[in-house]
UniProtKB/Swiss-Prot annotation:
One of its GO terms (cellular component) is extracellular region. Its main location: secreted. It is found in: Secreted. Its EC number is 3.4.24.39. It catalyses: Preferential cleavage of bonds with hydrophobic residues in P1'. Also 3-Asn-|-Gln-4 and 8-Gly-|-Ser-9 bonds in insulin B chain. This is Neutral protease 2 homolog BDBG_03102. Secreted metalloproteinase that allows assimilation of proteinaceous substrates. Shows high activities on basic nuclear substrates such as histone and protamine. The lineage of its organism: Eukaryota, Fungi, Dikarya, Ascomycota, Pezizomycotina.
Amino acid sequence: MRSPQSILAIVAFATTAIAGVVPSTEKRADDIPELDVKLTQVEGTLVKAVVTNNGDEDLNILNLNFFKDTAPVKKVSVYSQGAEVPFAGVRLRHKTSGLSPEVFTHLGPGESFEDEFDVAFTADLSQGGRIVVKAEGFASTTDTDGDTLSGVVHYKSNELEIDVDGKAAAKNFASLNQFSKRTRLTGCTGSRGSAATRAIRDSAPLAAMAAGAARNGGRAFTQYFKTNDQQVRNLVAARFDAVAREASSTTSGRTTYYCDDPYGICSPNVLAYALPSRNIISNCPAYYSLSHLTWRCHGQDRVTTSIHEFTHTPGVFSPGTDDLAYGHQAATSLSTWEALNNADSFSLFANAVYLGC
């Protein structure tokens, strides 16, 4: 999928546009988090997070792409000398329905759970020195004993300062590099290869359609991106245009796309994942249980899942998106700034454009 077209001009536009879209002093109605996250240093770059339900209602919290996830996902942001250290782990797209009970943690009011993880595993801290670690975002929830995501809660942590031993951190980061150098698949064959190739191929016209709809603005755009501002519309359209270019070829481009999981990341609840630092995308077995294109508004399918993953990779359009919220209800609760940085906002908007939702 290596595209011959340079995206330097787009990158420059994106950086400038994102910086000007939302004032840094923007306030949200939900500034008080339902989940409190207490970060403490265990040893070296090993960190403990204690997640507590601050509210007065029971919560059933999804652990995928959150604390307690065993995959190398982004749980915290790491800052060095005032700048965020690039995240080098994986970004997962998981199911929004049919989820297994074991991926949820139930928290009653005042109850907590703990998680320990090494921040040097997914961030290059080899330069050493003082870093600041913090977490803020949204966690997906479902009704108690449910298997379909139905809500979202805001979480926020304290700021944790750590003095890092660069040599020790480099060894931890090297373990991720070793993890990422396992034998790769040489290609896509059989029914899965055909399904993936078709989905990638059809991602191109759908992304182009979404780009046109974004430029025109309207109800669906405002629903997902919380504004009809022309600058924001152009920025969203530019990312969709880049996805359309990347998906237009399965033999050249800026990303490497695998039909199956070469790194052992997949689980029954994960559809696909991206390794943005290497511009790698991989489907999971659950991807192939999806329909090619759904006829259900806000639903998941193979084509929009591929679009979701393409938006993560900075080789397609920089900066790549994050995973801030999953599903229609959570994605439409985001601010403009957050939606511009949320992969599911793009895939759900493409679904809305295709079906006229």
